Amino acid sequence: MDPQTAATLLPLLGWALHGSVLTRRLASARRDPLTGLHTRAGWTARAEHCIHRHPRAAVLLVDLDHFKTLNDTHGHAAGDAALIATAHRLSSWCGRHGTAGRLGGDEFVTAIRDLDAVDLDALTTALHQPTNYDGTALPLAASVGVCRVAELPVPALTDALAAADAAMYAAKGRSRRGSRPAR
Protein backbone atom coordinates (compact mmCIF):
# COMPACT_ATOMS: atom_id res chain seq x y z
CA MET A 1 0.00 0.00 0.00
CA ASP A 2 1.38 3.39 -0.90
CA PRO A 3 1.91 5.99 1.87
CA GLN A 4 -0.80 8.32 0.52
CA THR A 5 -3.49 5.59 0.69
CA ALA A 6 -2.32 4.50 4.15
CA ALA A 7 -2.47 8.11 5.37
CA THR A 8 -6.04 8.35 4.11
CA LEU A 9 -7.25 5.02 5.49
CA LEU A 10 -5.59 5.10 8.90
CA PRO A 11 -7.81 7.87 10.39
CA LEU A 12 -10.91 6.14 8.99
CA LEU A 13 -9.86 2.89 10.62
CA GLY A 14 -9.32 4.72 13.92
CA TRP A 15 -12.80 6.26 13.78
CA ALA A 16 -14.36 2.90 12.95
CA LEU A 17 -12.66 1.26 15.93
CA HIS A 18 -13.63 4.15 18.20
CA GLY A 19 -17.27 3.86 17.07
CA SER A 20 -17.28 0.12 17.73
CA VAL A 21 -15.83 0.55 21.22
CA LEU A 22 -18.29 3.34 21.99
CA THR A 23 -21.23 1.24 20.81
CA ARG A 24 -20.16 -1.66 23.04
CA ARG A 25 -19.73 0.64 26.05
CA LEU A 26 -23.15 2.21 25.57
CA ALA A 27 -24.74 -1.23 25.26
CA SER A 28 -23.01 -2.47 28.43
CA ALA A 29 -24.13 0.65 30.31
CA ARG A 30 -27.73 -0.25 29.50
CA ARG A 31 -27.51 -3.91 30.58
CA ASP A 32 -26.80 -5.17 34.07
CA PRO A 33 -23.77 -7.46 33.77
CA LEU A 34 -24.97 -9.86 36.49
CA THR A 35 -28.60 -10.38 35.51
CA GLY A 36 -28.67 -9.34 31.86
CA LEU A 37 -31.68 -7.10 32.54
CA HIS A 38 -31.80 -3.47 31.54
CA THR A 39 -30.16 -1.04 33.95
CA ARG A 40 -32.14 1.97 35.15
CA ALA A 41 -30.85 3.94 32.15
CA GLY A 42 -31.77 1.22 29.67
CA TRP A 43 -35.15 0.52 31.25
CA THR A 44 -36.28 4.14 31.65
CA ALA A 45 -36.48 4.94 27.93
CA ARG A 46 -38.48 1.77 27.27
CA ALA A 47 -40.78 2.39 30.22
CA GLU A 48 -41.45 6.00 29.16
CA HIS A 49 -42.38 4.74 25.70
CA CYS A 50 -44.62 2.04 27.19
CA ILE A 51 -46.61 4.28 29.51
CA HIS A 52 -47.16 6.95 26.87
CA ARG A 53 -48.29 4.50 24.17
CA HIS A 54 -50.39 2.13 26.25
CA PRO A 55 -53.20 3.61 28.37
CA ARG A 56 -53.52 0.41 30.44
CA ALA A 57 -49.81 0.29 31.31
CA ALA A 58 -48.56 -0.48 34.79
CA VAL A 59 -45.25 -0.14 36.61
CA LEU A 60 -44.24 -2.79 39.13
CA LEU A 61 -41.46 -2.47 41.68
CA VAL A 62 -40.07 -5.73 43.10
CA ASP A 63 -37.87 -5.92 46.20
CA LEU A 64 -36.47 -9.18 47.52
CA ASP A 65 -37.44 -9.83 51.13
CA HIS A 66 -34.66 -10.62 53.60
CA PHE A 67 -32.00 -10.44 50.88
CA LYS A 68 -29.32 -9.17 53.28
CA THR A 69 -29.92 -12.16 55.55
CA LEU A 70 -29.64 -14.56 52.61
CA ASN A 71 -26.43 -12.85 51.49
CA ASP A 72 -24.93 -12.87 54.99
CA THR A 73 -25.93 -16.48 55.70
CA HIS A 74 -25.08 -18.14 52.39
CA GLY A 75 -22.51 -15.74 50.91
CA HIS A 76 -22.43 -13.26 48.06
CA ALA A 77 -22.33 -15.94 45.36
CA ALA A 78 -25.62 -17.29 46.71
CA GLY A 79 -26.99 -13.75 46.73
CA ASP A 80 -25.95 -13.38 43.10
CA ALA A 81 -27.73 -16.66 42.30
CA ALA A 82 -30.88 -15.28 43.93
CA LEU A 83 -30.63 -12.07 41.89
CA ILE A 84 -30.11 -14.00 38.66
CA ALA A 85 -33.05 -16.32 39.40
CA THR A 86 -35.28 -13.35 40.20
CA ALA A 87 -34.25 -11.57 37.01
CA HIS A 88 -34.98 -14.67 34.94
CA ARG A 89 -38.41 -15.15 36.53
CA LEU A 90 -39.32 -11.49 36.09
CA SER A 91 -38.15 -11.44 32.49
CA SER A 92 -40.03 -14.65 31.69
CA TRP A 93 -43.18 -13.28 33.30
CA CYS A 94 -42.98 -10.03 31.31
CA GLY A 95 -42.54 -11.90 28.05
CA ARG A 96 -43.87 -9.88 25.15
CA HIS A 97 -46.03 -7.76 27.47
CA GLY A 98 -43.36 -5.46 28.85
CA THR A 99 -39.79 -4.92 29.87
CA ALA A 100 -37.90 -5.68 33.06
CA GLY A 101 -34.93 -3.94 34.63
CA ARG A 102 -32.73 -3.99 37.69
CA LEU A 103 -32.61 -0.71 39.54
CA GLY A 104 -29.76 -1.86 41.75
CA GLY A 105 -29.15 -4.08 44.73
CA ASP A 106 -32.18 -6.32 45.13
CA GLU A 107 -34.68 -3.96 43.47
CA PHE A 108 -36.23 -4.78 40.13
CA VAL A 109 -38.79 -2.98 38.02
CA THR A 110 -41.12 -3.75 35.13
CA ALA A 111 -43.26 -1.73 32.77
CA ILE A 112 -46.21 -3.74 31.45
CA ARG A 113 -48.37 -2.62 28.52
CA ASP A 114 -51.58 -4.01 30.02
CA LEU A 115 -51.66 -5.40 33.54
CA ASP A 116 -54.93 -7.21 32.80
CA ALA A 117 -53.16 -9.23 30.07
CA VAL A 118 -50.75 -10.83 32.55
CA ASP A 119 -51.24 -12.89 35.69
CA LEU A 120 -49.90 -10.99 38.69
CA ASP A 121 -50.48 -13.99 40.96
CA ALA A 122 -48.25 -16.07 38.68
CA LEU A 123 -45.46 -13.52 39.16
CA THR A 124 -45.87 -13.55 42.93
CA THR A 125 -45.83 -17.35 42.94
CA ALA A 126 -42.73 -17.48 40.73
CA LEU A 127 -40.88 -14.97 42.89
CA HIS A 128 -41.51 -17.10 45.99
CA GLN A 129 -40.09 -20.33 44.60
CA PRO A 130 -36.76 -21.37 46.11
CA THR A 131 -33.71 -21.37 43.88
CA ASN A 132 -31.03 -24.01 43.92
CA TYR A 133 -27.51 -22.92 44.73
CA ASP A 134 -24.66 -25.35 45.34
CA GLY A 135 -27.05 -28.15 46.32
CA THR A 136 -29.03 -25.94 48.69
CA ALA A 137 -32.57 -24.69 48.13
CA LEU A 138 -32.41 -20.98 48.90
CA PRO A 139 -35.75 -19.57 50.03
CA LEU A 140 -36.81 -16.55 48.01
CA ALA A 141 -39.55 -14.06 48.72
CA ALA A 142 -40.37 -10.66 47.29
CA SER A 143 -42.69 -7.75 47.83
CA VAL A 144 -44.27 -6.23 44.74
CA GLY A 145 -45.76 -2.76 44.41
CA VAL A 146 -48.06 -2.08 41.48
CA CYS A 147 -49.08 1.23 39.93
CA ARG A 148 -51.63 1.38 37.14
CA VAL A 149 -50.53 4.44 35.22
CA ALA A 150 -54.12 5.34 34.26
CA GLU A 151 -54.88 5.95 37.94
CA LEU A 152 -52.30 8.75 38.15
CA PRO A 153 -53.38 12.38 37.65
CA VAL A 154 -50.68 12.70 34.97
CA PRO A 155 -49.07 9.62 33.39
CA ALA A 156 -45.45 10.30 34.37
CA LEU A 157 -42.87 7.59 34.97
CA THR A 158 -41.45 9.26 38.08
CA ASP A 159 -44.92 9.37 39.64
CA ALA A 160 -45.59 5.75 38.65
CA LEU A 161 -42.32 4.64 40.25
CA ALA A 162 -43.10 6.60 43.42
CA ALA A 163 -46.59 5.06 43.66
CA ALA A 164 -45.25 1.54 42.98
CA ASP A 165 -42.55 2.12 45.61
CA ALA A 166 -45.14 3.18 48.20
CA ALA A 167 -47.27 0.14 47.35
CA MET A 168 -44.23 -2.14 47.62
CA TYR A 169 -43.41 -0.82 51.09
CA ALA A 170 -47.05 -1.28 52.08
CA ALA A 171 -46.80 -4.92 50.95
CA LYS A 172 -43.60 -5.31 53.02
CA GLY A 173 -45.29 -3.79 56.04
CA ARG A 174 -48.33 -6.00 55.65
CA SER A 175 -46.44 -9.29 55.84
CA ARG A 176 -44.00 -9.31 52.96
CA ARG A 177 -44.32 -12.04 50.35
CA GLY A 178 -47.02 -10.38 48.32
CA SER A 179 -48.12 -7.69 45.94
CA ARG A 180 -50.09 -4.57 46.54
CA PRO A 181 -51.64 -2.03 44.18
CA ALA A 182 -50.95 1.67 44.65
CA ARG A 183 -53.66 3.56 46.52
UniProtKB/Swiss-Prot annotation:
<comment type="function">
    <text>Might be involved in pSAM2 replication control.</text>
</comment>
<dbReference type="Pfam" id="PF00990">
    <property type="entry name" value="GGDEF"/>
</dbReference>
<keyword id="KW-0614">Plasmid</keyword>
<dbReference type="InterPro" id="IPR052155">
    <property type="entry name" value="Biofilm_reg_signaling"/>
</dbReference>
<dbReference type="InterPro" id="IPR029787">
    <property type="entry name" value="Nucleotide_cyclase"/>
</dbReference>
<protein>
    <recommendedName>
        <fullName>Uncharacterized 19.3 kDa protein in repSA 5'region</fullName>
    </recommendedName>
</protein>
<dbReference type="InterPro" id="IPR043128">
    <property type="entry name" value="Rev_trsase/Diguanyl_cyclase"/>
</dbReference>
<feature type="domain" description="GGDEF">
    <location>
        <begin position="55"/>
        <end position="183"/>
    </location>
</feature>
<dbReference type="InterPro" id="IPR000160">
    <property type="entry name" value="GGDEF_dom"/>
</dbReference>
